[in-house]
C-alpha cells in the first residue's frame, strides 16, 4: 500500500510541468520565432483558443460513485459462493433446509467403460438375486405412483449462498455444550 501511494505521488510530481507565467501574446511570438518556416502549423495553432495551463478545472466526483465502481470491479459475492457451495433441498412441508446427498455415486469414465463390458456378458443369476430384482421392480412401480414437486427433483441444481458471519454463529452454537434435565 505504501509503495502504491509512493508511486502515485511520484507520478504526480513528475507530471506537473514547470511553466512560468506568460501572456498569450508572448507565447505566440516565441512560437513564430522558433519556426518561421512552418507558417501553416503556427496559423492553425493560433486559431484555436489558448488556455492557460496553470488554470485547471477541478470537478468533484461523489465518493458514492467511486465506491460503487470499486465494488462492481471486485464482485465479492462470487468469492462467498465459491466458499460455501453445497446442494440443499427445501422441504415444502416444514420449510427446513437439509443437505442433499446423492444416492448413487457418479462413476468415472473408465469405470463406465468397464461396466458396459461386463453387462454385455451373459451371467446366470441365483434365485436370491432374481427375487431381489423382482422386489426392486415392485418397489419401483410402487414409488412411481407418487408425484414429487419439481423443485425436489432438481435438488442438485440449487445452490445456497451463505453469509460467512452466520456460518460462524452456527458453528459456535453447535460447539457450546448444553445441559439436559435428568
From Swiss-Prot:
Main location: secreted
Source taxon at top rank: Eukaryota
Entry-linked InterPro entries: Alpha-s2_casein, Casein, Casein_CS
GO molecular function: protein homodimerization activity; zymogen binding
Positions of modified residues (Phosphoserine): 22-24
Gene Ontology annotations for the cellular component aspect, listed alphabetically: extracellular space
Keywords from the named record: Milk protein, Phosphoprotein, Secreted, Signal
Annotated tissue distribution: Mammary gland specific. Secreted in milk.
Subcellular location: Secreted
N-terminal signal peptide: 1-15
Family classification: Belongs to the alpha-casein family.
Primary role: Important role in the capacity of milk to transport calcium phosphate.
Name of the protein described by the UniProt record: Alpha-S2-casein
Gene (UniProt): CSN1S2
Amino acid at each position: 500500500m505504501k509503495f502504491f501511494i509512493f508511486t502515485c505521488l511520484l507520478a504526480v510530481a513528475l507530471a506537473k510541468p514547470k511553466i512560468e507565467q506568460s501572456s498569450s501574446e508572448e507565447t505566440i511570438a516565441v512560437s513564430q520565432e522558433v519556426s518561421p518556416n512552418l507558417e501553416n502549423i503556427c496559423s492553425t495553432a493560433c486559431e484555436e483558443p489558448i488556455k492557460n495551463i496553470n488554470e485547471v478545472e477541478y470537478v468533484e466526483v461523489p465518493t458514492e460513485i467511486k465506491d460503487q465502481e470499486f465494488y462492481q470491479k471486485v464482485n465479492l459475492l462470487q468469492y462467498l459462493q465459491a466458499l460455501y457451495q453445497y446442494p440443499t433441498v427445501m422441504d415444502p412441508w416444514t420449510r427446513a433446509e437439509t443437505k442433499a446427498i446423492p444416492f448413487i455415486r457418479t462413476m468415472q469414465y473408465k469405470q463406465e467403460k468397464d461396466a458396459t463390458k461386463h453387462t454385455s456378458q451373459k451371467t446366470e443369476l441365483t434365485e436370491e438375486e432374481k427375487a431381489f430384482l423382482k422386489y426392486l421392480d415392485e418397489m419401483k412401480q410402487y414409488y412411481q405412483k407418487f408425484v414429487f414437486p419439481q423443485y425436489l427433483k432438481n435438488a442438485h441444481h440449487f445452490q445456497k449462498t451463505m453469509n460467512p458471519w452466520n456460518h460462524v454463529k452456527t458453528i459456535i452454537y453447535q460447539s457450546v455444550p448444553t445441559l439436559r434435565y435428568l
